[in-house]
């Protein structure tokens, strides 16, 4: 049976890995999930990620989680737009996450970006998740 929400699965793996104080978690690879991980890395929520071949033709990401003074950098990671309920926002209606302390990750016509980058580029789109 195929998985319906692959991004939600990856975010849950990150959340569970940080709850268990893991240094590294693995998640199935795709270009879209790689773009989301790139935003998380740029914003400083994960240390790094790399793609590797688990079996011939099967690629996965190795995600290095980030901690500060023994505590996870990500306090909360929440999926907003799901396959059953899409959430879209124009740039005017895009709310700041936790008064600007967190970020929202958006899928826009110009690619996957954080809410700050979307405001600078003046584009709205699908609100994928919030990270705090």
Model-identified regions with their sequence ranges:
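Core subunits and conserved enzymes of cellular information-processing
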Residues: 1-132
């Amino acid at each position: 049976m195929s998985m319906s929400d692959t991004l939600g699965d990856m975010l849950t793996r990150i959340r569970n890995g940080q709850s268990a104080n893991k240094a590294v978690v693995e998640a199935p690879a795709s270009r879209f999930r790689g773009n989301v991980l790139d935003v998380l890395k740029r914003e400083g929520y994960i240390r790094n990620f790399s793609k590797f071949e688990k079996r011939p033709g099967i690629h996965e990401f190795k995600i290095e989680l980030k901690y500060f003074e023994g505590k996870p950098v990500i306090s909360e990671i929440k999926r907003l737009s799901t396959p059953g309920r899409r959430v879209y926002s124009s740039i005017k209606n895009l709310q700041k996450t936790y008064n600007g302390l967190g970020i929202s990750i958006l899928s826009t016509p110009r690619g996957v970006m954080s809410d700050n980058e979307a405001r600078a580029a003046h584009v709205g789109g699908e609100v994928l998740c919030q990270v705090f």
